[in-house]
Swiss-Prot record:
The lineage of its organism: Bacteria, Thermotogati, Deinococcota, Deinococci, Thermales. It comes from Thermus aquaticus. Destroys superoxide anion radicals which are normally produced within the cells and which are toxic to biological systems. Mn(2+) binds at H29, H84, D167, H171. Binds 1 Mn(2+) ion per subunit. Its EC number is 1.15.1.1. Belongs to the iron/manganese superoxide dismutase family. InterPro entries: Mn/Fe_SOD, Mn/Fe_SOD_BS, Mn/Fe_SOD_C, Mn/Fe_SOD_N, Mn/Fe_SOD_N_sf, SOD_C_sf. One of its GO terms (cellular component) is cytoplasm. It catalyses: 2 superoxide + 2 H(+) = H2O2 + O2. GO terms for molecular function: metal ion binding; superoxide dismutase activity. Homotetramer. Its cofactor is Mn(2+). Keywords: Manganese, Metal-binding, Oxidoreductase. This is Superoxide dismutase [Mn].
Amino acid sequence: MPYPFKLPELGYPYEALEPHIDARTMEIHHQKHHGAYVTNLNAALEKYPYLQGAEVETLLRHLTALPADIQAAVRNNGGGHLNHSLFWRLLTPGGAKEPVGELKKAIDEQFGGFAALKEKLTQAAMGRFGSGWAWLVKDPFGKLHVISTANQDNPVMGGFAPIVGIDVWEHAYYLKYQNRRADYLQAIWNVLNWDVAEEIYKGA
């Protein structure tokens, strides 16, 4: 939905991902961090009514066409809103814990199986210095790739469709895992919902 953007409801309680992701982290991450991205994105667009009918993906794809004074705010906060909206969907409790359907077939063909994809995504996440995301994305020709982006940059800015995103900002894990990013990444495989990923893949 376009402006005014709203913080999406999770659809599940903050404690639903315990013990892998703790309830306090989920609450702060959703209400405070994601909430701030939504507030700041709306503030950036407030004085530009002609942009208020655009979806956030469109704004991010065409950043350089936006007024110079809001480009950074839209990049950071629009990206943060889009990234987290996908992330919460992928963490929906239940569902398959490994790829299914058409996405499974594509992963098997292009990566040699789920284990190889997990290794690549984990490497991308561990290799991202500072804050950012690791992604499984689809290019315009249907091929899958593993990439990482800095800060809140979203793959749509590079012409990719995000399928799975893993948040490696410290706010995603620090209360429980402190500086142990590797432990967080090991845990997150227990809560990713691959039925949701399949829906996203088929719609991308």
